[in-house]
Amino acid sequence: MSMSTVPACIEPVAPLAPQAQDLRCFNTLGLASHAPAFVALTEPSQLPALSALAPRFRQLVVLGGGSNVVLPASIDGLVAQVRLPGVRLVGQCADAWVVEAAAGENWHGFVTACVDNGWDGLENLALIPGTVGAAPVQNIGAYGVELADRFHSLTAWDVKGGRWVEMGAAECRFAYRDSFFKHQEPGAWVIGSVRFALPRPWQPVLDYPDLQRHAALDGAAPTARAVYDAVCAIRRAKLPDPAVVGNAGSFFKNPLVDAGTRQALLGRFPGLVSYPQPDGRYKLAAGWLIDQCGWKGRQLGAAGVHDRQALVLVNRGGAQARDIMALAAAIQGDVERRYGVRLEPEPVVVPAR
């Protein structure tokens, strides 16, 4: 793989002093979790210190907003939360704005700032929880747009190599809810900043049925602000607020199947919800599969399935990782027995050791 090393700046190394930390408020599922060793990364100059510190621990767990992780009751290792701040316009040309955001920026806050400044193109990704740095790892997507569609490049810290590396789309190897980073040793990389190429002129992406049905987008030429507002309204109506009900957003990926499998399923289940993909495959609506298995609104111990969106697993109070994963396994089993399709979880499941 071709990557370019960023020349190191000559600056003092900021020290890191690990401390014990309760992580219940550091994950949107609200799971009880404890880190005996925790550090917050607030400036790039701390990354060399992280490289020096990490080998002393069994594992390094890198956290962003904690919106796409399942944390164990106790983590035997070092937990580093990325809080690097900053948003700036770094370039523009005839067909794109290039906007850079530091990894610790709140994702929705960044999208809002782009809309406010007329840097359009990310509005379909509004209200996705988490941070900018976590977004490329998952290749987040919603309502017809993926991060990869707007990606320019990123800068990441190679923890073992002790260097900053510049990576383009080819190096990141984006796929559906997937990237290069998800196939590396956990804690091997810390994303420092991400740059986005936002199209000029802008065209709305309204392929998703919910957006097509939204009254605010009935006009002939909807603005980016109107799309942003519609996405926020739809998400608030369908998805629980993690500040009120602990959840990690969509817990399962929409499974991809070939045309033959989809046709066979349609023969048995005429109401099957599916979406054609550019490569000829079909994406099945995981929420529909789960709902048809009778899981919407059900509870298993302290974990449950949201009553309005079957893709969302929730913490009903006092849940731990084992409760969430037991519920996920039960759902996977029912869906596979009925449809012959295996659902894959979206969140990263952090091992205790």
Swiss-Prot record:
Keywords: Cell cycle, Cell division, Cell shape, Cell wall biogenesis/degradation, Cytoplasm, FAD, Flavoprotein, NADP, Oxidoreductase, Peptidoglycan synthesis. Pathway: Cell wall biogenesis; peptidoglycan biosynthesis. It comes from Bordetella parapertussis (strain 12822 / ATCC BAA-587 / NCTC 13253). It is found in: Cytoplasm. GO terms for biological process: cell division; cell wall organization; peptidoglycan biosynthetic process; regulation of cell shape. Belongs to the MurB family. It is an enzyme of class 1 (oxidoreductase). Its main location: cytoplasm. This is UDP-N-acetylenolpyruvoylglucosamine reductase. Cell wall formation. Its cofactor is FAD. InterPro entries: FAD-bd_PCMH, FAD-bd_PCMH-like_sf, FAD-bd_PCMH_sub1, FAD-bd_PCMH_sub2, MurB, MurB_C, MurB_C_sf, Oxid_FAD_bind_N. One of its GO terms (cellular component) is cytosol.
